[in-house]
Amino acid sequence: MKVTLPDFRRAGVLVVGDVMLDRYWYGPTSRISPEAPVPIVKVDAIEERPGGAANVAMNIAALGCHSRLVGLTGIDDAARALGARLSEVDVTCDFVAVATHPTVTKLRVLSRNQQLIRLDFEQGFDDVDAAPMIERIQLALPKTGALVLSDYAKGALARVREMITLARAAGVPVLVDPKGTDFDRYRGATLLTPNLSEFEAVAGPCKDEETLVSRGMKLIADYQLSALLITRSEQGMTLLQPGKDPLHLPTQAQEVYDVTGAGDTVIGVLAAALAAGNSLEDSCFLANAAAGVVVGKLGTSTVSPIELENAIRGRAETGFGVMTESELKQAVAVARQRGEKVVMTNGIFDILHAGHVSYLANAQRLGDRLIVAVNSDESTKRLKGESRPVNPLAQRMTVLAALEAVDWVVPFSEDTPQRLIADVLPDVLVKGGDYQPHQIAGSKEVWDNGGDVLVLNFEDGCSTTNIINAIKRRAGQRTVV
């Protein structure tokens, strides 16, 4: 199944549901409390992340898609923290603040990556007037490519049937992450995304694939759905649609550290892809790939376009090929989160030869990821004359990207890559030839950041100029210097 990423930037998704704040307290534990037989955690780090429907909205925004979030909060520090964090990642918040209720907050205490306890602060919003929620939805629907209803049974979706009716009347697909066993309240939705246990709680235990499919199709008919996506943990996910064969997508997870928020990622990526114009099948494929990435992270997390692109290409999450500067910065950030050492070099690489290959292999051995910055055609002409480059930029970058030693290839248009190096700040900056380290463009910035600057030897007798001159001699033309 070949799927490409759509242009998420042209899409908009409205998320409505139960927003919450996930708080994490981290610290070591080395002794038992004298007051009770419980461990003492010395808290040395605190983290706050949007959860529930807010995590769905973050996953959508992380792809570059316009994300608007409607939900209920209290008037408290948790609501302010939630709004501030969401604003940082370009989620448009349209909250209804309720003075009589606290913002739903879940506090987790962790030590050595193990969760010791979770404390929930919540009252439920079932008794709150939902009219302001409906008004906000009506105003947002005309600019929305898809509506996500994220149900955590906290009361924000008390009038969910009305929300579905409004969206369908506006021609907007409705995707629901359900909660509980009353699926009738989601009647008429475009798609439901229950996990296997949620599905079986409604449809009954499924001993085999045939039973799962038949009961899923019955559920679609009973509740007038357009489709059903059952997420099945290590068994992947299954898409059911009337009149079509079931589509089973095997899991793509390589390592599973934490499944917290994985369902939010699935429905968020699925909605963003649909809103951007992908088919439902292709959107499910992308959502499945995103789930495989996010479960490899700790806590509620998002997936970037770079990670998703790499996941669907079946390569390592942070490494492949030709990139723009903004994509490179994202990829480097992901690599650093994994503790990887980033090496960077630059050059024209006009006619790739054995000396280049040997040099790049040696550079790659200095770290975990190798960036090659390549002079643009205009930059090359200024440095080498009007007869260069022999090969245009796109071809030079394609050849470099095919080398096993190279992770990322990025162009630059200036005479030197100093600005780009200062922006990326690699752990190791490498240049080949007879330079002194202080002469290398970007060396000061790398040193100031605590990095290393190294000079590697080129292989004797190998140069692009020598190759060009040899070709010209054989053709009887004037050689170049």
UniProtKB/Swiss-Prot annotation:
Active site: D264
UniProt region (Ribokinase), positions on chain: 1-318
InterPro entries, per the entry: Bifunc_HldE (IPR023030), Carboh/pur_kinase_PfkB_CS (IPR002173), Cyt_trans-like (IPR004821), PfkB_dom (IPR011611), RfaE_dom_I (IPR011913), RfaE_dom_II (IPR011914), Ribokinase-like (IPR029056), Rossmann-like_a/b/a_fold (IPR014729)
Residues that bind ATP: N195, L196, S197, E198
A single MF term (Gene Ontology): heptose-1-phosphate adenylyltransferase activity
Keyword terms of this UniProt record: ATP-binding, Carbohydrate metabolism, Kinase, Multifunctional enzyme, Nucleotide-binding, Nucleotidyltransferase, Transferase
Associated pathway: Nucleotide-sugar biosynthesis; ADP-L-glycero-beta-D-manno-heptose biosynthesis; ADP-L-glycero-beta-D-manno-heptose from D-glycero-beta-D-manno-heptose 7-phosphate: step 1/4; Nucleotide-sugar biosynthesis; ADP-L-glycero-beta-D-manno-heptose biosynthesis; ADP-L-glycero-beta-D-manno-heptose from D-glycero-beta-D-manno-heptose 7-phosphate: step 3/4
Superkingdom of the source species: Bacteria
Region: Cytidylyltransferase, residue numbers: 344-481
A Pfam family it matches: CTP_transf_like
Keyword Glycosyltransferase: no
A single cellular component GO annotation: cytosol
EC number(s) recorded for this UniProt protein: 2.7.1.167, 2.7.7.70
Transmembrane segments: none
GO biological process: ADP-L-glycero-beta-D-manno-heptose biosynthetic process
Catalytic activity: D-glycero-beta-D-manno-heptose 7-phosphate + ATP = D-glycero-beta-D-manno-heptose 1,7-bisphosphate + ADP + H(+); D-glycero-beta-D-manno-heptose 1-phosphate + ATP + H(+) = ADP-D-glycero-beta-D-manno-heptose + diphosphate
Cited HAMAP family: HldE (MF_01603)
PANTHER family linked: BIFUNCTIONAL PROTEIN HLDE
Known role: Catalyzes the ADP transfer from ATP to D-glycero-beta-D-manno-heptose 1-phosphate, yielding ADP-D-glycero-beta-D-manno-heptose.
Complex and partners: Homodimer.
Family: In the N-terminal section; belongs to the carbohydrate kinase PfkB family. In the C-terminal section; belongs to the cytidylyltransferase family.
Protein name per Swiss-Prot or TrEMBL: Bifunctional protein HldE
Gene: hldE
